[in-house]
Amino acid sequence: AFGGQAAPQAYGRAIADGSVLALVAALGMAPSSHESDVAAVQLAAVALAMAGALGLLLPRAAPQQARGHLVLWLVGLLALTLSGAAWVAVGLPLILGATQRGGHPEWLGEHAKPNPKPAKRAVWLGLLVTLVPALALGIWHGPVLSATPVWATPVAWLQWLGWFLWPTWPLLLWTLWVWRRQWRTRPLLLAGLWLLWTLLPSLVAQGPRLLALTLPAAAMLAALALPTLRRGLSALIDWFAVAFFSGSAFVLWLYWAGMTFAYPQAAAKTVSRLVPGFNAELDWTLLLPAVAVTFAWLGAIVWRVRHYSMALWRGLALSAAGAVTSWVLLMTLWLPLLNHGLSYQQAAQRVASQWSEDRGCIDATDLEPSALAALRHDAGLQVRVGRDALACPAQLIAQSASNPEPAQTEGWRVLDRFAPINPRVMQWTLWQRSAR
């Protein structure tokens, strides 16, 4: 009415910038950064598919743009299917179809009419891309699903979910409240259904990694809250990010000094107790990037204090920068410790000492993806899971450390039993099929 308002494209790009920052800031991005895990591929695939789906709902997009969105959509679905999450991928075309038919197009403008043809075509092609490979290869159930979920209680699941989605979930809830009367507009409907669908597999997963599939939809919903935040609330988010990530960086540096120089002694004793046998050495190739990113973090704080930005994404800038800072410090200062305490390399080599590749394959259906990668890459073993592993002459089973003795099974004998990482958490038992 008064002029000076942002153009729709500029406004949309600012929201998109905020969603990227919300995704980067999410703590759930960190777990897959150190391990050889398929979760990173699945996260990228979900993000690609979502970007394509949103583009396909645009009104009267140019043919070249529509083809580009369709390619993103199909590549994302195919990658998600082949990475072992076909049960997730097959539902996404149905969500796109439901959004196209049931969503209101008010967000497109008064006189804009959606073009249903690209979205309808994408639904059928998406079902084809997901169903054909899944049925042909028999990959409906990936190795991350379990008949007995890892969550002891619903509260434990909610705690992991809150940790994975921090700091996006408070903004997500605010979006759902502020825009509750517009929930049938297509961006909100698509992101909401997408979030609910990607949440379901985590309820029956072997671990929390499948929660990462929720991050793209959660980041988009969180970004839609940014235009409604008051200046005081945005500043509160900033200062919380400064306090939280500065404290995190201080703790990381403190324990690095303890494990490297044995000072402070309390930190050194804690590391020795939690990771026995670890001896840290000063590595300049890891230290210099850590110093650089720490100064960059301090510079980001100074920039935010001295300059007031009118950009919509300002409330998430420090959260994203702090998350990147903590991740870089973990991957530099703490990398030797993580390799020693969390890597399956030594465990894989121990299995290889008991079972050589020429003796046949090993059934490792019970193991998580990072352990499978270590057995294949570090030990060079033939590892199989699921139905392909039924005929293997050896079996590697993961059991709780509270069960000290493996149950005897007719036709099998124990070759070795040891703790792959932490003896208080898990034990591996290597079984060999007895000769008949």
What are these model-predicted stretches?
Residues 28-42, 85-88:
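Short acidic/glycine- and proline-prone juxtamembrane loop motifs at membrane-interface regions
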Residues 2-4, 32, 59:
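Transmembrane alpha-helix boundary signature
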